[in-house]
Amino acid sequence: MSEKYVVTWDMFQMHTRKLSERLLPATQWKGIIAVSRGGLFPAAVIARELGIRHIETVCISSYDHNQQGNLNVLHAAQVKNGGEGFIVVDDLVDTGNTARAIRELYPNARFVTVFAKPAGANLVDDYVIDIPQNTWIEQPWDMGITFVPPLARK
């Protein structure tokens, strides 16, 4: 990855609330399936905004911080009718590998992400922000606030 896109908590909240608006009316949804781990954060915001209390998870491992590896389904939420009436939420669709596995598990769910890269954008039903394919996203939950020394030292 040659570029980085740093997401602050404020940006994340704003983008996720925008995504939530697109999911109204809330009464059409039975619940949310959050893709662990990155989808847990936007799922919490969407659940709050839409008043949804039923939250399931699907746990898929494919990243080791900044390297994508083999896909491994660790846990899949058991919902009826291919996820009909559920919103599947992830933070990002990148290459589409995870998204394809999600689509197989929940073909009738509404699949949304906050961010999308070109290789996977067509695999989700909605997203808010386009990200170039060669860009690494630094999510706020992966960062900490630290002291940065001034440029001019005395």
Curated annotation (Swiss-Prot):
InterPro entries: PRibTrfase_dom, PRTase-like, Xanthine_Guanine_PRibTrfase. It catalyses: GMP + diphosphate = guanine + 5-phospho-alpha-D-ribose 1-diphosphate; XMP + diphosphate = xanthine + 5-phospho-alpha-D-ribose 1-diphosphate; IMP + diphosphate = hypoxanthine + 5-phospho-alpha-D-ribose 1-diphosphate. One of its GO terms (biological process) is XMP salvage. One of its GO terms (molecular function) is hypoxanthine phosphoribosyltransferase activity. GMP binds at residues 94-98, 136-137. Pfam families: Pribosyltran. 5-phospho-alpha-D-ribose 1-diphosphate binds at residues 37-38, 90-98. Its cofactor is Mg(2+). Guanine binds at residues 94, 137. Xanthine binds at residues 94, 137. Mg(2+) binds at residue 91. It is a peripheral membrane protein. The keyword Manganese does not apply. It is found in: Cell inner membrane. Pathway: Purine metabolism; GMP biosynthesis via salvage pathway; GMP from guanine: step 1/1; Purine metabolism; XMP biosynthesis via salvage pathway; XMP from xanthine: step 1/1. Its main location: membrane. Keywords: Cell inner membrane, Cell membrane, Glycosyltransferase, Magnesium, Membrane, Metal-binding, Purine salvage, Transferase. PANTHER family: XANTHINE PHOSPHORIBOSYLTRANSFERASE, XANTHINE-GUANINE PHOSPHORIBOSYLTRANSFERASE. Homotetramer. Belongs to the purine/pyrimidine phosphoribosyltransferase family. XGPT subfamily. Purine salvage pathway enzyme that catalyzes the transfer of the ribosyl-5-phosphate group from 5-phospho-alpha-D-ribose 1-diphosphate (PRPP) to the N9 position of the 6-oxopurines guanine and xanthine to form the corresponding ribonucleotides GMP (guanosine 5'-monophosphate) and XMP (xanthosine 5'-monophosphate), with the release of PPi. To a lesser extent, also acts on hypoxanthine. This is Xanthine-guanine phosphoribosyltransferase. It comes from Histophilus somni (strain 2336) (Haemophilus somnus). The gene is gpt.
